[in-house]
Amino acid sequence: MSPHGDGRGQAQGRAVRVGLRRSGGIRGGVAVFAAVAAVFTFTLPPSVPGGDSGELITAAHELGVAHPPGYPLFTLVAKLAITLFPFGSIAYRVNLLCGLFGAVAASLLFFTVFRLSGSSAGGILAAGVFSFSRLTWQWSIAAEVFSLNNLFVGLLMALTVHFEEAATAKERSKVAKIGAFCCGLSLCNQHTIILYVLCIIPWILFQLLKKKELSLGSLLKLSLYFSAGLLPYVHLPISSYLNHARWTWGDQTTLQGFLTHFLREEYGTFSLAKSEIGSSMSEILLSQVTNMRTELSFNIQALAVCANICLATKDRQNPSLVWLFTGMFCIYSLFFAWRANLDISKPLFMGVVERFWMQSNAVVAVLAGIGLAAVVSETNRVLNSNGLQCLEWLSATLFVVYQIYSNYSVCDQRTNYVIDKFAKNLLTSMPHDAIILLRGDLPGNSLRYMHYCEGLRPDISLVDQEMMTYEWYLPKMAKHLPGVNFPGNRWNPVEGILPSGMVTFNLYHFLEVNKQKETFVCIGIHEGDPTWKKNYSLWPWGSCDKLVPLEIVFNPEEWIKLTKSIYNWTEEYGRFDPSSWESVANEEMWQARMKTPFFIFNLAETAHMPSKVKAQLYAQAYDLYKEIVYLQKEHPVNWHKNYAIACERMLRLQARDADPEVLLSETIRHFRLYSQKAPNDPQQADILGALKHLRKELQSLRNRKNV
């Protein structure tokens, strides 16, 4: 047979193998999609989750612009899901959409591994271990951008494999164009994927150049396809120009405004947050490796390493793709660790950072799937046997089943109404026609969702404290807040006219022109503007506070009656993971029970008043503290300290018939409990010293009684 005949035969054989893998990969991918979609759909939260979900859903519902960089693709597709899905709350529909994104991502990971290795078991390992890790599962069933980002990670890797296997120049050109479009489209969601795009594009161009298929014309075409993928960003200036959305972020009607939003300048273009000092690069890298071992297991990490080691064998196919994927993982991990400026010692910030590790975990899962197939293949070659195929399937099955078993109870969110109840409690507690000055992601995003998407309390006006300091906020949003008077264009402690012509106003002036309405702050008040203090004070209103004119006299009995049962909150204390938004919401609602006694006690400590009135306030605070401390077995640890101090004040006052021995015993008991449960309190030494003194007093009192 001629050499040309051998070449044609090899090409035909390769084409047949690729064809079989392609059809098998599609069938397997569909099966993986169905299985993962079923699990994700079954465990979806029925209402709004925490984090950015409320804001993203509201932006989609209103067709506004989400926080930087805008996420236009997510916004438009979520709006489509809200319109087309005929069941569930608006939040549930977007949660379902994200669950389907996660299932597609799983099928693409399977497809990638199967096409690279020919191993269905390896593909199932990659898809299952990644999808059913706690981190991926948790963020695949919530209305967040991470699930769609996982989809694009899988899609870009699958297209890269497809390009490598393309047999003809025409097919390579077609895949390259589709890939260029998808690269552009992926940047319409989460920008962290640009690090993968910047690895894949040079690799594709190098392959085309090596095969002499890259010309100036083809490069121009690829650029046009990439640019076409960015078209969803047109939504930003259109939405901003129309200004129909009751909630939006930024003014993108100018090029400068568009670039400010697109480049995330309000957060810091290459940073996670504005004005934050984060953990060191080495700390974040070490935490990433530790987190990966927890999420995927050490065995998966080892298999990913094996995928690279097995490249040393001569008969391995597509080694450059394994190196490419490994390079993507390393570059992403190093860059993210460099720019993640959050302190991961704080559980909530750790929860923010770890979401971005999903992007690297997806690559590790693919490498592990390839590694499993490679280890089995090499072992079969050494043993000259095919008897390990069953072991390969058994390993993949065990890994996936273990992931589901380990994480199901944590990720089953079917009954999670925590953020929903938090927002509803805050809104329903408000008087008619009130103004709420929002502060922070938890109250801001959840209340906006309930107010704008679910139509709860349309009489209330929601104004964002932080946003009022931005020059775009009031020009865009004031018309959607008809019941609120703004004495200028921008909130600033220093009133005046800026060079741009904007009129600034302070909080005191804002409150004065809105005296006809009751105004509340949720949660907390902007520290940068203390002007309100000259004519207003903050009175506790559950998790929020009410701004009350100073001329109004505080009536403790009336206020206790108003705020004592302000919320209907039944969640157990401490039942949520500290890094979750559910934990933050639960903490806020529990601490709300303590705010009125704390306020009354503080009033007695600081205000100038007759001793009789002071004693009455101490007694009221003591009664309230005692009631909440003994009402629940588990409660916030600071309640012990506050109650102990209240007992000590009652003891010193001797204004009641209360037994001094009982008060001393209570003071000692709760100071001791507090010191045990909060050993890192800066006042720990003082508390221990006080305990020593109080025990002596108690002993002396008992001795006197005995005599």
Swiss-Prot record:
Molecular function (Gene Ontology), one example: dolichyl-phosphate-mannose-protein mannosyltransferase activity
Listed Pfam families: TMEM260-like
A GO biological process held by the record: protein maturation
Protein name, per record: Protein O-mannosyl-transferase TMEM260
EC code: 2.4.1.109
Disease / disorder: Structural heart defects and renal anomalies syndrome: An autosomal recessive syndrome characterized by central nervous system, cardiac, renal, and digit abnormalities. Clinical features include ventricular and atrial septal defects, truncus arteriosus, tetralogy of Fallot, partial anomalous pulmonary venous return, renal cysts, renal failure, and generalized edema. Some patients show partial agenesis of corpus callosum.
Domain of life assignment: Eukaryota
GO CC terms: endoplasmic reticulum membrane
Keywords in alphabetical order: Disease variant, Endoplasmic reticulum, Glycoprotein, Glycosyltransferase, Membrane, Transferase, Transmembrane, Transmembrane helix
